[in-house]
Amino acid sequence: MYDLETRKRVLALIRQGRSLNSVSKQTGISRYAIRAWTMRLEPIRRTTDCPRCAPEPRALEDPAAYAYLLGLYLGDGCVSPLRKGLYFLRIACADAWPGLIDSCAEAMRAVRPDNSVYRVQRQGCVMVTGYSKHWPCLLPQHGPGKKHDRVIALEPWQQEIVSTHPWEFVRGLVHSDGCRITNWTTKIVAGERRRYEYPRYFFTNKSDDIRRLFTDTLDQLGVAWRQTNAWNISVARRASVALMDAHVGPVYGNNLIRRWV
């Protein structure tokens, strides 16, 4: 948790015209956290109850963080029981993307600020893990078996959050089950062979429902897409790739997403 003065100093750098990437690199604070501070400066108050299972359910305090976390969960997350009514949420983040690991942990803390978040090293990845009794209320898509073997549908309150923060939801899905690649070809122009590059985004998930949530949100955002095979969604038109670059990537440091993350 960063104090208010730290947040103000970071936002002062942004107001100078600095990019999120450069400020993140200088301060060591994730782009996700800095972006969240531009929308809400004050730290979220700590609370021991759950906004969803309270006697009168209320709105989440950081819906943008929730939209991002929901995308990560639907891509590479799971909710499992532990003991005495406690559950843990685990999201797999590749070692190659430490910024993604930071952003995932920040989002998890923002959604459940009163619970601890841990990083558990596994071969090739870090399992960002949060313990809480309330993950089943916050992520009602959890259930036995694999996500693509069961129905995945958003509750009305979740859909409202996704509709209000669509880019955060798309970022979470792409960061968990997507990639940005660059195709290239050569052409002879004026007797000279020239190389032309064509960046595109892919999102791959076995669940028809999760792919539909992704494409429905892209439709809302005006991003053109097409399905290239049974599990794969492609975004390749130049204007749509530019939109994705502006909101999803470049991601961390000076690197674009170039491998599955």
What are these language model-derived features?
Residues 1-261:
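Internal intein/HINT superfamily modules and their associated LAGLIDADG
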